[in-house]
Amino acid sequence: MQLMRFDKPIGTLLLLHPTLWALFAAAGGIPSSSILIIFILGVIVMRAAGCVINDYADRHIDGKVKRTSQRPLATGRVTTVEAKVLFFVLLIIAFLLDLSLNQYAFLLSFVAVALAVIYPFMKRFTHLPQVVLGMAFGWAIPMAYGAVIEDLPLTCWLLFLANILWTVAYDTQYAMVDRDDDLRIGVKSTAILFAQYDNKIIALLQFLSLILFILFGWLSEYHIGYFIVLALTSTLFIYQCWLTKQRVREQCFKAFLNNNYFGFGIFIAILVGIYGF
């Protein structure tokens, strides 16, 4: 359970939010119950698989980082063989779920698997693993559009890009928690790359994501209520900037967790934009 992070649902929620945005936006309302269930289960399964492969990739370095030192693979409570078996079982479950989708979405699902597999290893080669994470967490967006309308319109890609910017911002907040440990062991991240400009760049990424959310709503011809809810939701970014101002580990992690509310706020904005209430 701990290996799959079922005890820490924040990652699942941050993956679920953009999935729901896309499903409801593509359907112009409530999507079919079958597609909704498949995608929700897919989020849970792929999030679990992502955690397993991430811990497998980091098994030799997690023990050197305060926050991750008690993870199952780092402590030896789970063997590498057990982790690999669990990962492939989860992939099989995800594959069976994908078989229930149309061919358009099914083919897109292979990209999702590729992103989930390569992401954990990116921190060894680039300071931008958060960008790959943004693509991985956002790939459910084109998959949702493909499953609902078998097309990938401009609004789909605006939502996808907005999600990448948002993800890089919040995962940089997350990486700020581990920055000292990462510098010591040689792991790369945007928190290290941005250095003393971290808070300013996070604010810029958040601002740019809001611009894309505005364009998305405008092209979707949403009710003005969408923009009102978006404006209210954006105040969470101001709160997060205040939290991370002093770069205190606990406050940076608190800012990261706060993004769950932002994701939910965007979902509410889309509902209001569609239904006009």
Curated annotation (Swiss-Prot):
Segments spanning the bilayer are 24-44, 81-101, 102-122, 129-149, 152-172, 201-221, 224-244, 255-275
Q: Name one GO molecular function term.
A: 4-hydroxybenzoate polyprenyltransferase activity
Q: Which GO terms describe its biological process?
A: ubiquinone biosynthetic process
List the GO cellular component terms: plasma membrane
Q: Does the keyword Cell inner membrane apply?
A: yes
Topological category with respect to the lipid bilayer: Multi-pass membrane protein
| Highest taxon listed in the record's lineage | Bacteria
Reaction(s) catalysed by this chain, per the record, are: all-trans-octaprenyl diphosphate + 4-hydroxybenzoate = 4-hydroxy-3-(all-trans-octaprenyl)benzoate + diphosphate
Q: Which cofactor does it need?
A: Mg(2+)
Reported EC number(s) for this entry are: 2.5.1.39
Q: Which family does it belong to?
A: Belongs to the UbiA prenyltransferase family.
* Reported function: Catalyzes the prenylation of para-hydroxybenzoate (PHB) with an all-trans polyprenyl group. Mediates the second step in the final reaction sequence of ubiquinone-8 (UQ-8) biosynthesis, which is the condensation of the polyisoprenoid side chain with PHB, generating the first membrane-bound Q intermediate 3-octaprenyl-4-hydroxybenzoate.
**Designated name of the protein:** 4-hydroxybenzoate octaprenyltransferase
- Give the species: Haemophilus ducreyi (strain 35000HP / ATCC 700724)
